[in-house]
A protein has these predicted regions:
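Extracytoplasmic
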Residues: 8-42
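Residue-level signature of mid-helix packing/kink "hotspots" within the transmembrane helices
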Residues: 25, 64-73, 158
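MFS 12-TM fold signature
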Residues: 64, 94-99, 183-187
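Conserved MFS/SLC helix-loop-helix module at the cytosolic interface between two early adjacent transmembrane helices
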Residues: 70-106
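Cytoplasmic helix-loop-helix junction between adjacent transmembrane helices
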Residues: 114-151
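Helix-loop-helix hairpin linking two adjacent transmembrane segments in secondary transporters
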Residues: 141, 148-199
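Flexible cytoplasmic inter-helical loops of multi-pass small-molecule transporters
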Residues: 195-225
Length: 244
């Protein structure tokens, strides 16, 4: 029953990570085109300008990783304090801004800032709220619910490179940025309309007192404890499979 009630939150998280799968590889998959957009001469692969263009893209990728690194430590604490919905919305909004930046900027520095922000959006916002959200929405099998995140990241990581080749060969490489931009807007809409189990429990806890408040808090603690349940062998196998 709980899984049905919070089905939209599960769909929201999975779609967000389908989008994240593209964000994770968008710079490397479109490196030459991005370098051209940022003002580098990419006509001769043997030239210093070509190498500088690729280095600029690599720098933006590195800033994405740095954004993940600096935000991963505090995202969980913030998520527990303000709830899952706000961080899912914030992450989607940041993704929209980042993809807009990638689409229009002609400056490598601005692109690096966008890369950093997308890293923060992923680890500081979505990882901190999305991972626990799917487990709380499906407490009967939290480990299995979590596997869906890895699955959708892998799906977009497999499909997106084919889109890159197709769009680039047809002269429409910017579609490679427009597609995840539109997906990010869908993520924002889903995050706004979806109910989240933790948020509902938190509101109920804040709106009651005495024994009722204790009961709601006990339900929240039980949901957190369920997420620490040792996964089955099949779940462990899938995690190892997608990790390597």
């Amino acid at each position: 029953m709980k899984a049905k009630k919070y089905l939209w939150s599960i769909i929201c998280v999975y779609f967000c990570y389908l989008t994240h799968g593209i964000q994770a590889i968008i710079l490397s998959q479109n490196n030459v085109n991005f370098a051209k957009q940022w003002g580098f001469n990419m006509a001769d692969p043997q030239s210093a300008a070509y190498a500088a263009g690729l280095a600029a893209v690599s720098t933006a990728v590195a800033w994405t990783g740095f954004g993940k690194f600096v935000s991963v430590w505090i995202g969980g604490e913030i998520s527990d304090h303000v709830g899952r919905k706000k961080l899912m919305i914030g992450g989607a909004a940041l993704y929209i801004l980042c993809f807009l930046g990638f689409l229009f900027t002609k400056n490598a520095l601005v692109a690096s800032v966008c890369g950093f922000a997308s890293g923060v959006a992923t680890s500081g916002f979505w990882d901190a709220s999305g991972y626990p959200a799917v487990q709380e929405a499906y407490p009967a099998a939290p480990g299995s619910a979590l596997i869906g995140i890895k699955f959708f990241v892998s799906v977009s990581g497999m499909i997106y490179p084919f889109l890159v080749v197709h769009n680039a060969s047809s002269g429409n490489w910017k579609l490679n940025v427009i597609i995840p931009l539109v997906m990010s807007i869908v993520c924002l809409v889903l995050a706004i309309i979806a109910p989240f189990a933790y948020d509902d429990q938190k509101k109920a806890s804040e709106g009651t007192d005495g024994k009722s408040k204790d009961a709601v808090q006990a339900e929240i603690d039980a949901a957190k404890a369920a997420m620490l349940t040792k996964p089955g062998k099949f779940v462990v196998f899938l995690v190892m499979f997608y990790a390597f």
